[in-house]
Regions:
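Aromatic-anchored segments of alpha-helical transmembrane domains
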Residues: 6-11, 92-97, 172-182
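Structural signal for the C-terminal ends of transmembrane alpha-helices
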Residues: 12-13, 64-76, 155-162, 205-210
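Membrane interface segments of multi-pass transport proteins and intramembrane proteases
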Residues: 26-36, 62-79, 112, 211-223
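Membrane-interface interhelical connector segments
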Residues: 106-133
Length: 229
């Protein structure tokens, strides 16, 4: 449903992307600074460089913690094992593979800074129109925002209240990071919103896969008892 809504919005009103990005842009020749607003602040550049490293560190840390909780002496802390495992898997498969390796490398959408409206040479492409104007690391979807959205993974296998809480944390982190990228001219609004949807769908798939494997394992463990009875 969310995919349909976003698709309709950005298909019917594709210029919404340009309008939002224009809030953060000042053309050359006007008084004061020109370009995208966030580029005027060194702290934003630091955050931009730090987010990918945070994602890589989180995926590695999640994997190490998942192994630790399994191998340490004593009973397994299943809650933290599941949280660590889901965080690592969603960061690698969702952000790393689906977002960065598949979509960003093949969709070809130019970034705001690359289109004529904002001083570039390219032509604006609506979100759901694959293009050939970008060869690699393209605009659709936002990898930085995806890293923030991936925080929802921590609650994927928890109780409903836990899932909602971590979903809110993931939304907050993803939207905040995405807003900075829009203000830098690195992404359009649709890149950020579709990034969140892609990560949510990947998370839902991981949750469904885990629950399916757990249910199948439980059935196998009960099978000998049912045959004996």
């Amino acid at each position: 449903m969310a995919w349909v809504v976003l698709s309709l919005v950005f298909t019917l009103w594709p210029m919404l992307d340009l309008s939002v990005s224009a809030w953060f842009y000042r053309a050359a020749g006007r008084p004061g600074w020109h370009g995208f607003a966030a580029d005027q602040f060194a702290a934003v550049a630091v955050i931009h460089e730090a987010v990918p490293w945070f994602g890589r560190s989180a995926s590695l840390l999640g994997l190490l913690l998942a192994v630790f909780w399994r191998l340490r002496p004593g009973p397994v802390n299943l809650r933290w094992w599941r949280r660590s495992l889901m965080l690592s898997l969603l960061m690698v498969l969702g952000t790393g593979v689906v977002v960065n390796a598949i979509l960003k490398e093949n969709w070809g959408r130019p970034r705001p800074v690359d289109v004529q409206t904002f001083g570039g040479a390219g032509t604006f492409e609506p979100a759901l129109h694959p293009s050939n104007q970008c060869d690699s690391n393209c605009s659709f979807v936002s990898g930085h925002a995806a890293t923030g959205f991936t925080l929802l993974a921590v609650g994927l296998l928890g109780a409903p209240a836990t899932r909602r809480r971590w979903l809110l944390w993931g939304l907050a982190a993803g939207l905040a990071t995405g807003a900075l990228r829009i203000a830098q001219g690195g992404h359009f609004l649709s890149d950020v919103l579709f990034s969140g949807l892609v990560i949510w769908l990947c998370g839902a798939a991981l949750r469904a896969g885990y629950l399916y494997l757990r249910a199948r394992r439980h059935r196998r463990l009960r099978l000998p008892q049912s045959e004996e009875g």
